[in-house]
């Protein structure tokens, strides 16, 4: 018989039933009958040995990272109605926020924070004062757990995947196999979500002492944080995007962003970059280097700071204009912009559009896509033939050479293109600019006219052709799939 069995066996035929002591860290009913009794951040006891349970709003976070062979870590800044930044400029003391440090033995057991303003629920955390600040510690590999709730209608993941919102009491990510919510938590969550929106709409939340202006980046000796607007997302290769950033100081910087790590970055978004360093080796342009623990975080829709910077920071394209004047541009230049209604549309590779569209269920369900490519050739090669006469009765087009000028004129141009996903194959792909139905009519910002007669229009289009086929020039376009072809729409050249 095992030792455990011997210890459990009674020494008498009749013995009193003993109540087993609860396992340390295990959930138990509170005096009010709830499984967990939630505490506000400023009211959590520093002297109690009991585990703490709480809801909080996340305002900043590192990306989960490995500290040694057996441990991963993630550090968050959290607030609630009892502990938050109460002024536009922080006092720099412990009254602005608490920190939450989560530990795990696996990367996937830690939360990935993509957006400031979302809500986290933590069970079984400990509390201590660290450098005068409240620090909650949660060991997920022991007994702690967490769950993330979206403050906006949809989570970042749902927005990326174009998924419908689920119940506002359902977490979009959590550490355990299952996540449940009790009735008493519903009001806590709803009230905190309401407070978070009011807080972010009334305060900057990320105060000016919590980040570095880009015009002072070069003077920084170590890591620093940044708040900036993404002016451009350029697909550098199949795994990496290059972000063009500009902040309120007017400085423009670039940084590399892994697609898998930061799938949520979009042109026009205001982001907080956690932990960047200045690249001393870059001579052609100013660059920020991101570390394995660096994070790029967007803001909830009600954010006052994001709205102000989104309106204030504009792209004057001076860097691109200077690059295009050079014989060889060392900076990638995206020559186009898409209509604002497609701003949140994720980018789809040419590989997916031309090789997987008929087999992928998600792609089959769509007819409008956003894609980025470079142009290797334009057909017809004679610019004068880019505009055709179009007979709407017969639905046939014809050359305008020698034509009287009556009837409808349309652009009929084919771009032979490639992108990072098709870089290594021998194929080129045709993307069409056929404007008979109005799609892409404003792409060139030139009216479709008889180019055999209109020399001014022809010269503008010849200049556009040169830019489109220039090294390091790219097109960011919205395309519509029709009868197996992809036609450009809601896209225009900006140079």
From Swiss-Prot:
The keyword Amino-acid biosynthesis is assigned to this record: no
A cellular component term, taken from the record's GO annotations: telomere cap complex
Residue numbers spanned by region Disordered: 1-31
Keywords recorded for this protein, A-Z: Chromosome, DNA-binding, Nucleus, Telomere
One Gene Ontology term from the biological process aspect of the record: telomere capping
Compartments, as annotated in UniProt: Nucleus; Chromosome, Telomere
MF (Gene Ontology): G-rich strand telomeric DNA binding; single-stranded telomeric DNA binding; telomerase inhibitor activity
InterPro entries: NA-bd_OB-fold, POT1, TEBP-like_OB2, Telomer_end-bd_POT1/Cdc13, Telomere-bd_alpha
Compositionally skewed regions (Polar residues) per UniProt: 1-13
Functional note: May function as protective capping of the single-stranded telomeric overhang. May also participate in telomere length regulation during DNA replication. Binds specifically to the T4G4-containing extension on the 3'strand and protects this region of the telomere from nuclease digestion and chemical modification.
Other notes: The sequence of the A (or alanine) version is shown. The S (or serine) version differs in only two positions, and the K version in only one. There may be other versions in addition to the S, A, and K versions.
Family of this protein: Belongs to the telombin family.
Subunit description: Heterodimer of an alpha and a beta subunit.
Name of the protein described by the UniProt record: Telomere-binding protein subunit alpha
Organism: Sterkiella nova
Gene from which this protein is expressed: MAC-56A
């Amino acid at each position: 018989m095992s030792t455990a069995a011997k210890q459990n066996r009674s020494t008498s035929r009749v013995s009193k039933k003993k109540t087993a002591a609860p396992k340390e860290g295990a959930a138990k009913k509170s005096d009010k009958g709830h499984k967990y009794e939630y505490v506000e951040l400023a009211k959590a006891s520093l002297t109690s040995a009991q585990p703490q349970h709480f809801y909080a709003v996340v305002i900043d976070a590192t990306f989960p990272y490995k500290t040694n062979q057996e441990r991963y870590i993630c550090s968050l800044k959290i607030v609630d109605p009892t502990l938050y930044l109460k002024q536009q400029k922080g006092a720099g003391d412990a009254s602005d926020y608490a920190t939450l440090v989560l530990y795990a033995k696996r990367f996937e057991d830690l939360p990935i924070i993509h957006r400031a303003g979302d809500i986290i629920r933590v069970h079984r955390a400990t509390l201590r004062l660290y450098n005068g600040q409240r620090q909650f510690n949660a060991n997920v590999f022991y007994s702690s757990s967490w769950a993330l709730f979206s403050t906006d209608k949809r989570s970042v993941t749902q927005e990326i995947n174009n998924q419908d919102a689920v119940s506002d009491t359902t977490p979009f990510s959590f550490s355990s196999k299952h996540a449940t919510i009790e009735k008493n938590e519903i009001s806590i969550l709803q009230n905190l979500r309401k407070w978070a929106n009011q807080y972010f709409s009334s305060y900057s939340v990320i105060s000016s002492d919590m980040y570095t202006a880009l015009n002072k980046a070069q003077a920084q000796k170590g890591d620093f944080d940044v708040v900036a607007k993404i002016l451009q997302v350029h697909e550098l290769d199949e795994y990496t995007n290059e972000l063009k950033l500009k902040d309120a100081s007017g400085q423009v910087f670039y940084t590399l962003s892994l697609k898998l790590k930061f799938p949520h970055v979009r042109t026009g978004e205001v982001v907080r970059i956690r932990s960047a360093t200045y690249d001393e080796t870059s001579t052609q342009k100013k660059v920020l280097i991101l570390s394995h623990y660096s994070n790029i975080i967007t803001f909830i829709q009600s954010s006052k700071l994001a709205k102000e910077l989104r309106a204030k920071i504009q792209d004057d394209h001076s860097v691109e204009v200077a690059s295009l004047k050079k014989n060889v541009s060392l900076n990638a230049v995206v020559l186009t912009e898409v209509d604002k209604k497609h701003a949140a549309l994720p980018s789809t590779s040419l590989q997916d559009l031309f090789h997987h569209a008929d087999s992928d269920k998600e792609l089959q369900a769509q007819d409008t896509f956003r894609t980025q490519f470079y142009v290797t050739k334009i057909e017809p090669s004679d610019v004068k033939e880019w505009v055709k006469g179009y007979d709407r009765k017969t639905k046939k087009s014809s050359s305008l050479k020698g034509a009287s000028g009556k009837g409808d004129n349309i652009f009929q141009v084919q771009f032979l293109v490639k992108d990072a996903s098709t870089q290594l194959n021998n194929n080129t792909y045709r993307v069409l600019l056929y404007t008979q139905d109005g799609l892409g009519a404003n792409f060139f910002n030139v009216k479709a006219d008889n180019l055999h007669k209109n020399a001014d229009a022809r010269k503008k289009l010849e200049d556009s052709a040169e830019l489109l086929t220039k090294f390091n020039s790219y097109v960011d376009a919205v395309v519509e799939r029709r009868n197996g072809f992809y036609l450009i729409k809601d896209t225009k050249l900006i140079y």
